[in-house]
């Protein structure tokens, strides 16, 4: 079986979403072309599943969950994909950014470790995995002012709501599936009226390391949101 460091034969776009918007798909294809140039291999988009012996380098459209499952494709280390691979669903979302409220329920594998380490760079908030815990967290946060409800599977600010009373939380919770909430979680965070969000990160591919920083900006999509 090829080792993780063996030369890759192709870059494969691994689209795990039910629906990917056309503009995002175009970006993924462009990124796959660039990765293929860096790795010195072809760019292909295969529908049939591959095997470890194919020695592909994968570009997933979202963070992959369950290392054992994706090992069947040959994805075992960072040298096998441009993206993330985590053990539990909540690790793939913003749920890791905040601790639980006291005595809250939590899914398998949960840890507050990252939230505690990053607390100096984050707003005050909580992650919850049940509606009862959401009410408790909201009560605590509302003591200091309005709070923001942040669905963890949404991106670019979509689906977020600001509330200033507990009563305003109830219709939002009513629309949430209890099972999905127990798996993925929900973030409740203090709300800021004027925000400047900085981003930092680092990527590694083909023996190269690239670090970046910048300031986030929001734009309107085709729905005007």
Annotate each predicted stretch with a short phrase.
Residues 5-6, 50-52, 181-182:
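Short helix-terminating capping/connector loops at secondary-structure junctions
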Residues 18-24, 63-71, 222:
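Short, surface-exposed beta-strand/loop "edge" segments at domain boundaries and coil↔beta transitions
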Residues 26, 72-73, 162-164:
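Short, glycine/charged-enriched secondary-structure capping and boundary segments
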Residues 2-24, 54-60:
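Short hydrophobic beta-strand segments
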Residues 198-202:
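Short beta-strand scaffold segments in enzyme catalytic cores
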Residues 96-187, 193, 203-208, 214-225:
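Active-site nucleotide/adenylate-binding loops and adjacent lid/helix of ATP-dependent enzymes
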Residues 29, 33-144:
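Conserved N-proximal alpha/beta basic substrate-recognition cap immediately N-terminal to
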């Amino acid at each position: 079986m090829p080792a993780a460091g063996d030369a890759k034969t192709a870059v494969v776009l691994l689209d795990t979403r039910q629906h990917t918007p056309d503009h995002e798909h175009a970006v993924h294809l462009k990124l796959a072309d660039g990765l293929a140039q860096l790795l010195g291999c072809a760019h292909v988009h295969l529908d049939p599943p591959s095997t470890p012996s194919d020695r592909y380098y994968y570009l997933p459209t979202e963070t992959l969950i369950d290392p054992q499952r994706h090992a069947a494709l040959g994805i075992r280390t960072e040298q096998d994909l441009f993206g993330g691979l985590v053990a539990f669903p909540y690790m793939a979302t913003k749920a890791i950014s905040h601790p639980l409220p006291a005595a809250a329920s939590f899914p398998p594998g949960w840890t507050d470790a990252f939230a505690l380490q990053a607390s100096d760079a984050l707003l005050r908030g909580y992650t919850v995995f049940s509606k009862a815990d959401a009410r408790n967290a909201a009560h605590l946060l509302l003591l200091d002012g309005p709070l923001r409800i942040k669905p963890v599977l949404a991106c670019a600010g979509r689906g977020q709501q600001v509330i200033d009373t507990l009563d305003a939380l109830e219709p939002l919770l009513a629309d949430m599936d209890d099972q999905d909430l127990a798996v993925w979680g929900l973030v409740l965070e203090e709300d800021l009226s004027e925000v400047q969000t900085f981003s930092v990160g680092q990527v590694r591919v083909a023996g190269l390391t690239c670090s970046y920083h910048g300031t986030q900006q929001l734009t309107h999509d085709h729905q005007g949101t």
